[in-house]
A protein has these predicted regions:
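Compositionally biased, intrinsically disordered low-complexity regions
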Residues: 8-12, 24
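C-terminal motif of bacterial Sec signal peptides marking the signal peptidase cleavage site
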Residues: 18-20
């Protein structure tokens, strides 16, 4: 047996000896010229029966292009590649398709010719693409739109930009119901209620997958993270969710059920635990509930290195019900270890066959057996005017007007305005995490350098485009200029993603520099219009009091002009809060329906020009 402690070149040689023999088995009964005869699901059992154990395990492996070459895909039969393009500044769709096709060509040269599937995290547009893709508002903003039809169109927009680069599978949508704004992934949630989860789960799946998954633009969707990750205690990412069975079923499951009913091809498990049991090791959740009770027949996928990060074993993950494992470099040791677990009887072959059946079923549904190579059909849609117009509409509809004293908004396009603040001219900040790289396009806490967001418009440039360059006085990040009567102060959070966004309740505040900036303009008698860029409500009561108008703009993405169009009256505000806005740290967590519910702004609150409203 190959030992899991083997590493590097010696390990690859050892694996190759096993695979080199096993992949040579005759397969004429299920293949024609190396391409499997899978045209319907009825063909899958014969292919499964003809596969070696090594080939089956290869299909269950997903890794990224930094960890596996196209030749590795051919030699070891790897089932999926995550297209996290290394920092090579590949800015064209053709360059990405070329990479995808290089991997696919090698997959098609395996004994059975089973295609691999290229996948990516596209959680708010094709946000990892180095070029001019459209970056959409994050889910917290989309939830504020209360417009599921728009969200379906945005998902279809994303699918077209993904397909233009050879990507056929996205790890989206996140349909967590976030119940504590301390949680660093709150911005990935549509809101604090199951009603919003259900309002947007199916439009996302419909937009990605379309009526015909084999269509040139369609991509497979992933509902995540199963289950109750938004309910983690104290908002601790990857922590434990203490929930009753009724809460689990009534609050956190319905969106997944809706996605399953619509045919979502995959579901990703949560890093977190439910009532002390890690989801990545839970047969009760992944098999008994998800597969058996809910009837999900798609692929159940781990999160990134979810087994290792969760402190679990491959045996636990396999027997819990995972079909595909997301690995980095560890695929090199995990594949022989998985084979050994089956050969020793610790994992039954039936469990492996179930996994591979689901993987082949997904690939069939994605049209990979009939159309394995990428298509340039939607290359011209990447960053197109039509796509940016739609994203700008999403920005406009996501904005929530919290305050508008004396009807100061909309502003007059003929007047001069000061624009100031850390987020006024910073596209990376307005896009947030999961943009160009994991923690965001800025220079992040890990020291990864900033990446450009090509084609994006900052908020200040959006204002300039709308009212003219001469009417905008740029005061920089923290400058003071009292020439104009009105100052648009754009401030907020620095981007973060999972693992870096959790906060103590008392720390959900603006920086001291930002607070001082707002106060300085207020004390000078300037009318302050505060635009807050954040992934959740913050404790900003004092800043609201110091502002004549206050706008929650969330994380609007690449189309900053959408903010300007509403501030200056081309469009009205229509956004509504998907989260209750706390008065103070002691109220956190606060959710609609709580006893003694008394937030600063209620769930569903949002003003239009001239009146306030509460929709739910």
């Amino acid at each position: 047996m190959i030992r899991t402690r083997l590493c590097g070149f010696a390990l690859l040689c050892a694996i190759a000896m096993v695979y080199g023999c096993s992949l040579a088995t005759d397969s004429d009964d299920v293949a024609v010229h190396g391409n499997p005869v899978i045209t319907t699901e009825d063909d899958i059992p014969a292919v499964i029966a003809a596969m070696t154990l090594e080939e089956k395990v290869g299909q269950m492996v997903q890794t990224d292009i930094a960890a596996a070459t196209p030749q590795d895909v051919r030699q070891f039969g790897i089932g999926s590649i995550i297209s996290l393009i290394p920092e090579g500044n590949l800015k064209t769709t053709q360059a990405w398709r070329s990479i995808a096709d290089d991997y696919q060509q090698e997959a098609l040269q395996t004994r059975l010719g089973i295609p691999m599937v290229f996948a990516i995290d596209a959680v708010h547009g094709h946000s990892y693409f180095d070029g001019n893709s459209v970056i959409l508002p994050h889910n917290i903003g989309l939830g504020a739109t209360r417009n599921p039809r728009l969200v379906e169109q945005l998902a279809k927009l994303t699918a077209k930009e993904l397909s233009a680069t050879g990507v056929r599978w996205t790890f989206s949508p996140t349909i967590a119901v976030a119940r504590n704004i301390r949680w660093g992934r709150t911005f990935e949630s549509f809101g604090e209620t199951v009603q919003l989860q259900q309002m947007f789960a199916t439009p996302f799946v419909e937009g990605y997958q379309g009526a015909d998954l084999t269509a040139a633009y369609a991509v497979g969707a992933t509902a995540k993270h199963f289950v109750a990750d938004g309910a983690v205690d104290d908002g601790v990412d990857r922590g434990n969710a203490t929930v009753t069975e009724m809460q689990l079923r009534a609050m956190h499951l319905p969106g997944f059920i809706d996605a399953i009913d619509l045919g979502v091809v995959s579901i990703m498990a949560s890093f977190s635990s439910v009532n002390g049991e890690k989801v990545h090791g839970s047969k009760a959740l992944l098999t008994d509930l998800l597969k058996n009770e809910l009837g999900f027949d798609g692929v159940v996928l781990t999160d990134w290195e979810g087994i290792d990060i969760g402190g679990l074993t491959l045996k636990e993950g396999l027997n819990a019900g995972f079909d595909m494992f997301m690995f980095a470099q560890s695929w090199k040791t995990s594949m022989p270890a998985m084979i050994e677990l089956v050969e020793s009887g610790e994992v039954p072959m039936a469990r492996i066959d179930d996994a591979v059946t689901r993987i082949l079923r997904m690939k069939l549904r994605l049209g990979l057996f009939s159309r394995p190579m990428s298509s340039p059909q939607y290359a011209d849609s990447m960053g197109s005017t039509a796509h940016r117009d739609l994203a700008r509409q999403a920005v406009r509809e996501s904005l929530v007007l919290l305050k508008n004293d004396a009807g100061i908004l909309p502003l007059d396009k003929q007047q001069s305005v000061v624009v100031v603040g850390s987020h006024a001219n910073n596209v990376a900040y307005q896009c947030g995490g999961w943009t160009k790289k994991w923690q965001g396009a800025h220079t992040d806490l890990y020291g990864h350098p900033a990446r450009p967001v090509d084609g994006a418009t900052s908020i200040i440039d959006g204002i300039r485009n709308l009212i003219g360059y001469d009417n905008v006085i740029d005061a920089g990040v923290s400058g003071f200029n009292d020439v104009a009567d009105v100052a648009i102060v754009v401030v907020g959070e620095t981007p973060y993603a999972e693992g870096q966004g959790d906060r103590a309740a008392a720390d959900l505040v603006l920086s001291s520099e930002q607070r001082t900036l707002i106060q300085r303009y207020h004390d000078a008698g300037t009318q302050v219009i505060t635009v807050l860029i954040s992934g959740r409500p913050l404790l900003v009561g004092d800043q609201i009091n110091q502002s004549a108008a206050f706008v929650a703009a969330w994380l609007p993405g690449s189309e900053g002009e959408g903010v300007a169009e509403v501030l200056f009256g081309d469009y009205d505000f229509s956004g509504k809060l998907g989260f209750s806005w706390p008065r103070n740290a002691n109220q956190i967590p606060i959710n609609v329906g709580d006893p003694d519910y008394d937030p600063l702004y209620e769930y569903g609150y949002g003003m239009t020009y001239g009146r306030s409203m509460v929709s739910e």
